[in-house]
A protein has these predicted regions:
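Start-transfer (signal-anchor) and selected internal transmembrane alpha helices
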Residues: 1-28, 35, 117, 127, ...
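Specific aromatic-rich, kink-prone transmembrane helix
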Residues: 172-178
Length: 178
């Protein structure tokens, strides 16, 4: 590996470790309930039903008389009101979290599925930085370094949504345009 690539990898590793140190892990093992914050719960239920049930039937996650969710008149079942996009991107993490939870933590109250769900936003945050770097290099912007892209991402406030409000769509939107 080139020396420059090793330095870039070292910078990304240090930044990743820094963000992992400031990430609050304690609340990540409690799944949102239908009465929790509407945004976070809505996106989580999209991802959960795709990653675990492999369908779009929310009846096993939501009650029909919940005030945060609409009822689809065609099927008379509750449906989260937020778009499904981030749920599609984070569903593979829930799927693998479910496998890990069933293999190793079957009798525990620890919710590994929700922890894996929270890691999806962090994964897409760092992949977005990598893709933006590649895009700028391919477009011929040689003066924009990897560190500048990291400054742009961190300065935009995106780490807050990746590490604290991981259920919202901000990180997934940046990934989509990277």
């Amino acid at each position: 590996m080139k020396v420059k690539n090793k330095k870039i990898l070292a910078v990304y590793l240090v930044v990743f470790i820094f963000f992992m140190l400031i990430t609050k892990i304690d609340f990540r093992t409690v799944e949102p309930q239908p009465y929790h914050s509407h945004d976070d719960a809505s996106y989580y239920f999209h991802a959960y039903t795709l990653g675990i049930d492999f369908d779009l039937d929310y009846s096993n996650q939501l009650s029909e008389n919940n005030r945060f969710y609409t009822t689809n008149n065609l099927i008379s079942k509750p449906v989260p009101t937020h778009p499904i996009g981030s749920g599609v991107l984070s569903a593979p993490f829930i799927f693998f979290g479910n496998i890990i939870e069933n293999l190793f933590f079957n009798d525990s109250n620890l919710r590994v599925i929700y922890f894996f769900y929270s890691m999806s936003a962090i994964f897409y945050f760092f992949i977005s930085g990598y893709l933006l770097n590649k895009t700028f290099k391919n477009l011929g912007y040689k003066s924009i370094s990897e560190l500048n892209i990291l400054y742009l991402l961190v300065g935009s406030g995106l780490p807050y949504f990746a590490f604290e409000r991981f259920g919202t769509t901000h990180v997934y939107e940046v990934f989509g345009i990277s």
